[in-house]
Design a protein with these regions (language model features):
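PLP-dependent amino-acid enzyme catalytic core
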Residues: 1-401
Length: 401
Protein backbone atom coordinates (compact mmCIF):
# COMPACT_ATOMS: atom_id res chain seq x y z
CA UNK A 1 0.00 0.00 0.00
CA UNK A 2 1.35 3.42 -0.96
CA UNK A 3 1.97 5.76 1.97
CA UNK A 4 3.27 9.29 2.32
CA UNK A 5 6.18 7.90 4.37
CA UNK A 6 7.18 5.78 1.39
CA UNK A 7 7.29 8.85 -0.84
CA UNK A 8 9.42 10.67 1.73
CA UNK A 9 11.75 7.66 1.81
CA UNK A 10 11.96 7.78 -1.98
CA UNK A 11 12.88 11.46 -1.72
CA UNK A 12 15.76 10.54 0.61
CA UNK A 13 17.01 7.74 -1.66
CA UNK A 14 16.78 9.87 -4.81
CA UNK A 15 19.01 12.62 -3.42
CA UNK A 16 21.99 10.69 -4.74
CA UNK A 17 20.80 10.59 -8.34
CA UNK A 18 17.84 12.88 -9.19
CA UNK A 19 17.82 16.68 -9.35
CA UNK A 20 15.29 18.82 -7.52
CA UNK A 21 14.25 20.47 -10.75
CA UNK A 22 13.42 24.16 -10.93
CA UNK A 23 9.90 25.53 -10.69
CA UNK A 24 9.83 28.65 -12.85
CA UNK A 25 7.21 31.34 -13.44
CA UNK A 26 5.88 31.43 -17.01
CA UNK A 27 4.25 34.85 -17.22
CA UNK A 28 4.84 35.21 -20.98
CA UNK A 29 3.53 31.79 -21.88
CA UNK A 30 -0.16 32.19 -21.12
CA UNK A 31 -1.11 35.83 -20.37
CA UNK A 32 -3.85 36.14 -17.80
CA UNK A 33 -2.94 32.85 -16.13
CA UNK A 34 -0.65 32.56 -13.08
CA UNK A 35 1.37 29.74 -14.61
CA UNK A 36 4.48 27.91 -13.38
CA UNK A 37 6.53 25.14 -14.96
CA UNK A 38 8.01 22.16 -13.11
CA UNK A 39 10.97 21.43 -15.38
CA UNK A 40 11.43 17.66 -15.31
CA UNK A 41 12.67 18.00 -18.89
CA UNK A 42 15.89 19.19 -17.21
CA UNK A 43 16.05 16.08 -15.01
CA UNK A 44 18.84 13.50 -15.22
CA UNK A 45 18.17 11.49 -18.46
CA UNK A 46 15.84 14.32 -19.54
CA UNK A 47 12.72 12.92 -17.89
CA UNK A 48 10.99 12.31 -14.55
CA UNK A 49 11.15 8.56 -15.18
CA UNK A 50 14.52 8.13 -13.47
CA UNK A 51 12.81 8.82 -10.12
CA UNK A 52 10.50 5.82 -10.16
CA UNK A 53 12.94 3.47 -11.88
CA UNK A 54 15.80 4.25 -9.52
CA UNK A 55 13.70 3.96 -6.37
CA UNK A 56 12.17 0.66 -7.46
CA UNK A 57 15.53 -0.90 -8.33
CA UNK A 58 17.17 0.45 -5.16
CA UNK A 59 14.68 -1.56 -3.09
CA UNK A 60 15.50 -4.92 -4.71
CA UNK A 61 17.15 -7.56 -2.55
CA UNK A 62 20.64 -8.86 -3.32
CA UNK A 63 19.07 -12.06 -4.67
CA UNK A 64 16.77 -10.09 -6.98
CA UNK A 65 19.61 -7.86 -8.18
CA UNK A 66 21.60 -10.92 -9.17
CA UNK A 67 18.83 -11.95 -11.57
CA UNK A 68 19.00 -8.65 -13.47
CA UNK A 69 16.11 -6.39 -14.45
CA UNK A 70 13.91 -6.15 -17.53
CA UNK A 71 11.60 -3.34 -18.60
CA UNK A 72 9.44 -2.09 -21.43
CA UNK A 73 9.40 1.53 -22.50
CA UNK A 74 8.89 4.02 -25.30
CA UNK A 75 12.17 5.58 -24.19
CA UNK A 76 12.18 7.56 -20.97
CA UNK A 77 11.58 4.70 -18.52
CA UNK A 78 14.18 2.76 -20.50
CA UNK A 79 16.81 5.38 -19.80
CA UNK A 80 15.87 5.54 -16.12
CA UNK A 81 16.14 1.76 -15.75
CA UNK A 82 19.43 1.66 -17.66
CA UNK A 83 20.99 4.41 -15.54
CA UNK A 84 19.80 2.93 -12.24
CA UNK A 85 20.81 -0.63 -13.07
CA UNK A 86 24.24 0.37 -14.35
CA UNK A 87 24.96 2.47 -11.26
CA UNK A 88 24.06 -0.49 -9.05
CA UNK A 89 25.97 -3.01 -11.15
CA UNK A 90 22.85 -4.84 -12.33
CA UNK A 91 22.25 -6.27 -15.81
CA UNK A 92 19.35 -4.60 -17.62
CA UNK A 93 17.31 -5.49 -20.71
CA UNK A 94 14.73 -3.10 -22.18
CA UNK A 95 12.08 -3.88 -24.81
CA UNK A 96 11.17 -0.81 -26.84
CA UNK A 97 8.67 -0.32 -29.70
CA UNK A 98 10.44 -0.11 -33.05
CA UNK A 99 8.96 3.34 -33.58
CA UNK A 100 10.66 4.78 -30.49
CA UNK A 101 12.77 7.88 -31.24
CA UNK A 102 16.28 6.92 -32.30
CA UNK A 103 17.86 9.25 -29.75
CA UNK A 104 16.01 7.49 -26.91
CA UNK A 105 17.09 4.07 -28.16
CA UNK A 106 20.73 5.10 -28.50
CA UNK A 107 20.74 6.87 -25.14
CA UNK A 108 19.38 3.73 -23.46
CA UNK A 109 22.19 1.69 -24.98
CA UNK A 110 24.81 4.24 -23.91
CA UNK A 111 23.51 4.06 -20.35
CA UNK A 112 24.28 0.34 -20.31
CA UNK A 113 21.08 -1.52 -21.16
CA UNK A 114 20.61 -4.24 -23.74
CA UNK A 115 17.81 -3.07 -26.06
CA UNK A 116 15.38 -5.26 -28.01
CA UNK A 117 13.20 -3.42 -30.53
CA UNK A 118 9.68 -4.84 -30.82
CA UNK A 119 7.38 -4.23 -33.78
CA UNK A 120 4.30 -2.23 -32.80
CA UNK A 121 3.40 0.01 -29.87
CA UNK A 122 4.39 0.25 -26.22
CA UNK A 123 1.83 -2.45 -25.39
CA UNK A 124 3.54 -4.87 -27.79
CA UNK A 125 6.88 -4.10 -26.15
CA UNK A 126 5.25 -4.78 -22.78
CA UNK A 127 4.02 -8.19 -23.90
CA UNK A 128 7.49 -9.11 -25.15
CA UNK A 129 9.12 -7.97 -21.91
CA UNK A 130 6.72 -10.11 -19.86
CA UNK A 131 7.50 -13.07 -22.13
CA UNK A 132 11.26 -12.60 -21.63
CA UNK A 133 10.81 -12.16 -17.90
CA UNK A 134 9.04 -15.50 -17.69
CA UNK A 135 11.81 -17.15 -19.70
CA UNK A 136 14.78 -15.63 -17.86
CA UNK A 137 13.55 -14.98 -14.33
CA UNK A 138 14.73 -11.37 -14.48
CA UNK A 139 12.90 -8.82 -12.31
CA UNK A 140 10.30 -6.84 -14.25
CA UNK A 141 10.38 -3.09 -13.62
CA UNK A 142 6.96 -1.82 -14.65
CA UNK A 143 6.98 1.75 -16.00
CA UNK A 144 3.89 2.85 -14.09
CA UNK A 145 1.73 0.17 -12.46
CA UNK A 146 3.99 -0.41 -9.46
CA UNK A 147 3.74 1.03 -5.95
CA UNK A 148 7.46 1.79 -5.59
CA UNK A 149 7.66 3.37 -9.05
CA UNK A 150 4.64 5.52 -8.17
CA UNK A 151 6.32 6.50 -4.89
CA UNK A 152 9.37 7.68 -6.81
CA UNK A 153 7.26 9.80 -9.12
CA UNK A 154 5.40 11.16 -6.09
CA UNK A 155 8.54 12.98 -4.95
CA UNK A 156 7.72 15.59 -7.61
CA UNK A 157 4.55 16.40 -5.70
CA UNK A 158 6.56 17.02 -2.52
CA UNK A 159 8.90 19.32 -4.43
CA UNK A 160 6.04 21.32 -5.93
CA UNK A 161 4.55 21.94 -2.47
CA UNK A 162 7.95 22.96 -1.16
CA UNK A 163 8.61 25.32 -4.08
CA UNK A 164 5.09 26.82 -4.34
CA UNK A 165 3.29 26.26 -1.02
CA UNK A 166 0.15 28.14 -2.12
CA UNK A 167 -0.29 26.25 -5.40
CA UNK A 168 -3.95 25.88 -6.45
CA UNK A 169 -3.74 23.45 -9.37
CA UNK A 170 -1.28 21.04 -10.98
CA UNK A 171 -1.58 19.76 -14.56
CA UNK A 172 0.11 16.42 -15.26
CA UNK A 173 0.57 14.35 -18.44
CA UNK A 174 -0.93 10.85 -18.39
CA UNK A 175 0.21 7.76 -20.24
CA UNK A 176 -0.22 4.74 -18.01
CA UNK A 177 -0.86 6.94 -14.99
CA UNK A 178 2.17 6.40 -12.75
CA UNK A 179 3.26 10.03 -12.70
CA UNK A 180 -0.12 11.55 -11.92
CA UNK A 181 -0.87 8.83 -9.35
CA UNK A 182 2.27 9.64 -7.36
CA UNK A 183 1.96 13.42 -7.70
CA UNK A 184 -1.76 13.42 -6.87
CA UNK A 185 -1.32 11.14 -3.85
CA UNK A 186 1.51 13.24 -2.42
CA UNK A 187 -0.21 16.58 -2.93
CA UNK A 188 -3.72 15.50 -1.91
CA UNK A 189 -2.31 13.87 1.26
CA UNK A 190 -0.88 17.22 2.35
CA UNK A 191 -3.12 19.76 0.56
CA UNK A 192 -6.40 18.01 -0.36
CA UNK A 193 -7.89 21.25 -1.73
CA UNK A 194 -5.33 21.47 -4.56
CA UNK A 195 -6.84 20.55 -7.93
CA UNK A 196 -5.04 17.80 -9.86
CA UNK A 197 -5.73 17.75 -13.59
CA UNK A 198 -4.56 15.13 -16.07
CA UNK A 199 -3.94 15.53 -19.81
CA UNK A 200 -3.76 12.90 -22.55
CA UNK A 201 -3.21 13.05 -26.29
CA UNK A 202 -6.53 12.86 -28.15
CA UNK A 203 -5.14 9.93 -30.14
CA UNK A 204 -4.36 7.90 -27.00
CA UNK A 205 -7.06 8.70 -24.41
CA UNK A 206 -7.06 5.41 -22.47
CA UNK A 207 -7.11 6.88 -18.95
CA UNK A 208 -9.43 9.73 -19.99
CA UNK A 209 -11.98 7.18 -21.21
CA UNK A 210 -11.55 5.01 -18.13
CA UNK A 211 -11.87 8.02 -15.81
CA UNK A 212 -15.10 9.31 -17.33
CA UNK A 213 -16.64 5.89 -18.02
CA UNK A 214 -15.68 4.65 -14.52
CA UNK A 215 -14.27 1.45 -15.95
CA UNK A 216 -10.89 0.10 -16.96
CA UNK A 217 -10.51 -0.48 -20.69
CA UNK A 218 -8.02 -1.03 -23.52
CA UNK A 219 -8.00 1.09 -26.67
CA UNK A 220 -7.80 -0.45 -30.12
CA UNK A 221 -4.94 1.91 -30.96
CA UNK A 222 -2.83 4.72 -29.51
CA UNK A 223 -1.71 7.12 -32.23
CA UNK A 224 0.22 10.26 -31.29
CA UNK A 225 3.67 11.73 -31.81
CA UNK A 226 3.77 12.15 -28.00
CA UNK A 227 5.34 8.70 -27.75
CA UNK A 228 5.83 8.93 -23.98
CA UNK A 229 2.07 8.75 -23.39
CA UNK A 230 1.03 6.51 -26.31
CA UNK A 231 -0.46 3.83 -24.06
CA UNK A 232 -3.47 1.70 -25.00
CA UNK A 233 -4.07 0.26 -21.53
CA UNK A 234 -3.87 2.23 -18.27
CA UNK A 235 -2.55 0.50 -15.16
CA UNK A 236 -4.93 -1.20 -12.75
CA UNK A 237 -3.31 0.36 -9.69
CA UNK A 238 -3.00 3.74 -11.37
CA UNK A 239 -6.63 3.67 -12.54
CA UNK A 240 -7.78 3.17 -8.96
CA UNK A 241 -5.55 6.01 -7.73
CA UNK A 242 -6.53 8.37 -10.54
CA UNK A 243 -10.21 7.68 -9.86
CA UNK A 244 -9.67 8.61 -6.20
CA UNK A 245 -7.24 11.54 -6.36
CA UNK A 246 -7.57 13.26 -9.76
CA UNK A 247 -10.18 15.98 -10.32
CA UNK A 248 -10.45 15.99 -14.13
CA UNK A 249 -8.79 14.61 -17.26
CA UNK A 250 -8.86 16.33 -20.66
CA UNK A 251 -7.33 15.64 -24.06
CA UNK A 252 -5.35 17.80 -26.48
CA UNK A 253 -4.88 17.44 -30.24
CA UNK A 254 -1.62 16.92 -32.11
CA UNK A 255 -1.74 20.50 -33.38
CA UNK A 256 -2.27 21.81 -29.85
CA UNK A 257 0.70 19.80 -28.58
CA UNK A 258 2.86 21.12 -31.43
CA UNK A 259 1.81 24.70 -30.65
CA UNK A 260 2.69 24.17 -26.98
CA UNK A 261 6.16 22.86 -27.84
CA UNK A 262 6.75 25.92 -30.01
CA UNK A 263 5.45 28.26 -27.29
CA UNK A 264 7.78 26.72 -24.71
CA UNK A 265 10.75 27.15 -27.02
CA UNK A 266 9.97 30.73 -27.98
CA UNK A 267 8.75 32.09 -24.66
CA UNK A 268 10.57 30.01 -22.05
CA UNK A 269 13.62 28.75 -23.99
CA UNK A 270 12.72 25.19 -22.98
CA UNK A 271 12.59 22.08 -25.15
CA UNK A 272 9.79 19.66 -24.27
CA UNK A 273 8.83 16.40 -25.91
CA UNK A 274 5.22 15.84 -26.92
CA UNK A 275 4.13 14.26 -23.65
CA UNK A 276 5.85 16.97 -21.63
CA UNK A 277 4.08 19.74 -23.53
CA UNK A 278 0.54 18.42 -23.02
CA UNK A 279 -0.10 20.33 -19.75
CA UNK A 280 0.92 23.59 -21.44
CA UNK A 281 -1.33 22.73 -24.40
CA UNK A 282 -4.25 22.27 -22.01
CA UNK A 283 -3.55 25.67 -20.44
CA UNK A 284 -2.98 27.50 -23.73
CA UNK A 285 -6.16 26.22 -25.35
CA UNK A 286 -8.49 26.73 -22.40
CA UNK A 287 -9.20 23.09 -21.62
CA UNK A 288 -9.34 23.66 -17.86
CA UNK A 289 -10.77 26.28 -15.44
CA UNK A 290 -7.52 27.99 -14.41
CA UNK A 291 -8.64 31.60 -13.91
CA UNK A 292 -7.47 32.90 -10.55
CA UNK A 293 -5.48 29.75 -9.81
CA UNK A 294 -1.73 29.44 -9.25
CA UNK A 295 -1.17 26.58 -11.67
CA UNK A 296 1.82 24.30 -12.19
CA UNK A 297 2.33 22.57 -15.54
CA UNK A 298 4.52 19.51 -15.09
CA UNK A 299 6.89 19.36 -18.07
CA UNK A 300 7.57 15.64 -17.79
CA UNK A 301 10.39 15.29 -20.32
CA UNK A 302 12.44 16.87 -23.07
CA UNK A 303 13.68 13.87 -25.04
CA UNK A 304 12.39 14.70 -28.50
CA UNK A 305 14.05 13.50 -31.70
CA UNK A 306 15.43 16.45 -33.67
CA UNK A 307 13.76 15.29 -36.89
CA UNK A 308 10.41 15.15 -35.15
CA UNK A 309 11.15 18.50 -33.51
CA UNK A 310 11.70 20.06 -36.94
CA UNK A 311 8.30 18.83 -38.13
CA UNK A 312 6.68 19.90 -34.88
CA UNK A 313 8.08 23.42 -35.21
CA UNK A 314 6.68 23.67 -38.74
CA UNK A 315 3.31 22.38 -37.53
CA UNK A 316 3.35 24.80 -34.63
CA UNK A 317 4.13 27.73 -36.93
CA UNK A 318 1.21 26.79 -39.18
CA UNK A 319 -1.09 26.31 -36.18
CA UNK A 320 -0.22 29.76 -34.81
CA UNK A 321 -0.56 31.51 -38.18
CA UNK A 322 3.17 32.11 -38.51
CA UNK A 323 3.61 30.08 -41.68
CA UNK A 324 1.30 29.33 -44.60
CA UNK A 325 1.18 28.24 -48.22
CA UNK A 326 -1.00 29.97 -50.82
CA UNK A 327 -1.91 28.60 -54.26
CA UNK A 328 -2.84 31.25 -56.84
CA UNK A 329 -4.10 30.79 -60.40
CA UNK A 330 -2.18 33.20 -62.65
CA UNK A 331 -2.00 34.27 -66.23
CA UNK A 332 1.41 33.04 -67.33
CA UNK A 333 2.84 36.38 -68.41
CA UNK A 334 5.59 38.75 -67.21
CA UNK A 335 4.91 40.86 -64.12
CA UNK A 336 2.36 38.62 -62.39
CA UNK A 337 4.78 37.33 -59.76
CA UNK A 338 5.96 40.88 -59.10
CA UNK A 339 2.40 42.08 -58.50
CA UNK A 340 1.70 39.24 -56.07
CA UNK A 341 5.00 39.85 -54.28
CA UNK A 342 4.23 43.55 -53.92
CA UNK A 343 0.88 42.79 -52.29
CA UNK A 344 2.43 40.29 -49.87
CA UNK A 345 5.20 42.76 -49.03
CA UNK A 346 2.75 45.61 -48.47
CA UNK A 347 0.92 43.42 -45.95
CA UNK A 348 4.17 42.90 -44.03
CA UNK A 349 4.70 39.20 -44.78
CA UNK A 350 7.81 37.50 -46.15
CA UNK A 351 7.99 35.18 -49.17
CA UNK A 352 10.24 32.20 -48.38
CA UNK A 353 9.50 29.94 -51.37
CA UNK A 354 8.07 30.25 -54.89
CA UNK A 355 7.01 27.48 -57.24
CA UNK A 356 5.34 27.72 -60.67
CA UNK A 357 3.29 24.72 -61.81
CA UNK A 358 2.41 24.54 -65.51
CA UNK A 359 1.80 20.77 -65.61
CA UNK A 360 -1.92 20.54 -64.76
CA UNK A 361 -3.74 19.00 -67.74
CA UNK A 362 -6.90 20.97 -66.99
CA UNK A 363 -5.09 24.29 -67.02
CA UNK A 364 -5.15 26.65 -69.97
CA UNK A 365 -1.90 26.84 -71.92
CA UNK A 366 -1.56 30.50 -70.95
CA UNK A 367 -2.10 29.89 -67.23
CA UNK A 368 -0.14 28.46 -64.30
CA UNK A 369 -0.40 27.84 -60.59
CA UNK A 370 1.82 29.89 -58.31
CA UNK A 371 2.57 28.32 -54.94
CA UNK A 372 3.94 30.70 -52.32
CA UNK A 373 5.44 29.79 -48.95
CA UNK A 374 4.99 32.71 -46.55
CA UNK A 375 6.24 33.72 -43.12
CA UNK A 376 3.45 35.64 -41.42
CA UNK A 377 2.66 37.30 -38.11
CA UNK A 378 -0.63 35.59 -37.29
CA UNK A 379 -3.85 34.20 -38.77
CA UNK A 380 -5.33 37.70 -39.14
CA UNK A 381 -2.44 38.76 -41.37
CA UNK A 382 -2.95 35.69 -43.55
CA UNK A 383 -6.61 36.63 -44.04
CA UNK A 384 -5.61 40.20 -44.93
CA UNK A 385 -3.20 38.92 -47.59
CA UNK A 386 -5.89 36.69 -49.09
CA UNK A 387 -8.35 39.58 -49.15
CA UNK A 388 -5.88 41.95 -50.85
CA UNK A 389 -4.96 39.35 -53.46
CA UNK A 390 -8.64 38.70 -54.21
CA UNK A 391 -9.34 42.43 -54.48
CA UNK A 392 -6.48 42.70 -56.99
CA UNK A 393 -8.16 40.10 -59.20
CA UNK A 394 -6.09 37.05 -58.30
CA UNK A 395 -7.85 33.73 -57.82
CA UNK A 396 -6.90 31.70 -54.75
CA UNK A 397 -7.32 27.96 -55.15
CA UNK A 398 -7.23 25.06 -52.72
CA UNK A 399 -3.80 23.48 -52.63
CA UNK A 400 -3.81 20.12 -54.33
CA UNK A 401 -2.46 16.98 -52.67
Amino acid sequence: MLTLDKIYHAKFVLKQVARKTDLIAATRLCPGTDLYLKTENLQVTGSFKVRGAYYKISQLSAEERAKGVIACSAGNHAQGVALAATRMGIKSVVCMPDGAPIMKVESTKRLGAEVELVKGTYDDAHDRAVELQEQTGMIFIHPYDDELVIAGQGTIGLEILDQLPDVDAVIVPIGGGGLISGVAFAIKSLRPEVKIYGVQAAGAPSMEHAFHDHKYETLDSAVTFADGIAVKTPGETTFDMVSQYVDEIVTVSEDEIAAAILALMENQKLVAEGAGATPVAAALFGKLPLAGKKTVCLISGGNIDVNILSRVITRGLVMSGRKTNLMIALEDKPGQLSLVSDIVSACGANVVSVHHDRSDANMAITSCFLKLGLETRDAAQIETIKQKLTEAGFKLVTERT
